[in-house]
Amino acid sequence: MAGAFDFDLEKNPPVVQSTADNSSDGAVPGETFTYGDSTYAKIQRLAAELNIEQRGIERVPAAEQTDTSVFNIGSMWLAANMVVSSFAIGVLGKSVYSLGFVDAILTVLFFNLLGIMTVCFFSCFGPFGLRQMVFSRLWFGWYVTKGFAVLNILACLGWSAANAIVGAQMLHAVNSDVPGFAAILIISICTLLVTFAGYKVVHLYEYWSWIPTFIVFMIILGTFAHSGDFQNIPMGVGTSEMGSVLSFGSAVYGFATGWTSYAADYTVYQPANRSKRKIFLSTWLGLIVPLLFVEMLGVAVMTATDIKGSKYDVGYATSGNGGLIAAVLQPLGGFGDFCLVILALSIVANNCPNFYSVALTVQVLSRYAQRVPRFIWTLFGTGVSIAIAIPGYSHFETVLENFMNFIAYWLAIYSAIAIMDHFVFKRGFSGYVVENFDKREKLPVGIAATIAFGFGVAGMITGMSQPWYVGPIARHAAGGDVGFELGFAFAAFSYLCLRPFEIKFFGR
């Protein structure tokens, strides 16, 4: 394999005699961040001395797109999903939706295949040199993108909190004297140390971190298979089964598609001439392998709780996912505890994209926010995530289920509008005038996107199924959640109808 990290990203000298870039493509060379005597420049010079990535949402020049390894793309998502959070999604099949083994496995398979497609698709836009939310301006316009940025910030923070709770459960299962808030702090601070440094360190960490986690999951698989405690819970029948499959599928889809809104953030240093097919395939492999393996493992292990009073049942009731896995590893003694610690720390790989991208997304909100260096926003986002995770620790299942559905809803609408615009109105990658990304007068007005979003929300409401509300179409689907499917369909159809009028009246 070619050297994956033989490139040098943004390690700029502390003082560079240069002027701002005046090229027509809007790209900003890295050395310009340290030019001048402003507070911003001084902070950036300090960052350069510490080898911290200085670039925020500024477009990456072609000369700095030196990440030539395709494996860096796949390993990013391989590590981010080869984690205990994926295991927790599989557990929901029985714990929340009361599915049997085979139907839960099939749901995991098909909804993951559907959910990852948009992540693979949007990863292909990174070589344009723009972060995902910045590139979104070319679909939604200057102001509408800010609304999606707010949703993306909520998604990043929510993901970070939910994942930290899973890791905290693992640490609590190892040592019950470790309170939930302390475990959340440990995991969040470890993640901050990686993401604070920036793109190169994030990719370097993700490149290797999946290996020990994969080994631990193989140990869990082997130990559980040897125990003979697997229970082949039969499939359900009738309309209630359909409702459970659709609702669990929505949660699985939400987890798989959750990276959609910042997929391009992790391919911006790929060369501009990188094959879109290679990016798509590398992303697909990096996602589908860990998602299917770990979620299906979670489905299988959770079947053992069907025996009431068993160590699995007691462990899950006491310490959630951590207690369940601890029950599997119990025969291994102290080595089993070591494996639990490895799994707890796997959350760092899971949360790196969230901590890194939340900072970039905040910068999209205003010029003032962009003037605050990325790494400072990363620090701020970490604090907010901790504040969300600690009170949510004791209500994890409810938090996770509701959050997965929220992710599925809004990302389905976002994807529908962007995909329709790409294939119908831009007619492929050649139809973009990327240089207009920061020229609001040349971007779409956003009226069509706004109305389409409203229609998407209407579709979502009619199809959603939550404890506090069940939409009329969901009721006809046996209470199954079809919110993301209807949100996508309503948004796509309405955008196709409205966008031609927007182009006709505004010319953009």
From Swiss-Prot:
Keyword annotations of the record: Cell membrane, Membrane, Phosphoprotein, Transmembrane, Transmembrane helix, Transport
Localization: Cell membrane
Disulfide bonds: none
Protein name from the UniProt record: Purine-cytosine permease fcyB
Topology, Cytoplasmic side: 1-72, 126-147, 199-200, 265-278, 345-374, 426-442, 499-508
CDD domains: SLC-NCS1sbd_CobB-like (cd11484)
A GO BP entry: purine nucleobase transport
Sequence ranges on the Extracellular membrane side: 94-104, 169-177, 222-243, 300-323, 396-404, 464-477
Family: Belongs to the purine-cytosine permease (2.A.39) family.
Statement: the UniProt record of this protein carries the keyword Transit peptide: no
Function: This permease has a broad specificity towards purines, and also transports cytosine, but neither uracil nor thymine. Contributes very little in purine uptake. Its major role may be the uptake of cytosine.
Lineage of the organism: Eukaryota, Fungi, Dikarya, Ascomycota, Pezizomycotina
Gene Ontology annotations for the cellular component aspect, listed alphabetically: plasma membrane
Main location: membrane
Membrane-traversing stretches: 73-93, 105-125, 148-168, 178-198, 201-221, 244-264, 279-299, 324-344, 375-395, 405-425, 443-463, 478-498
Single GO MF annotation: transmembrane transporter activity
InterPro entries documented for this protein: Pur-cyt_permease, Pur-cyt_permease_Fcy2/21/22
UniProt superkingdom: Eukaryota
Membrane topology: Multi-pass membrane protein
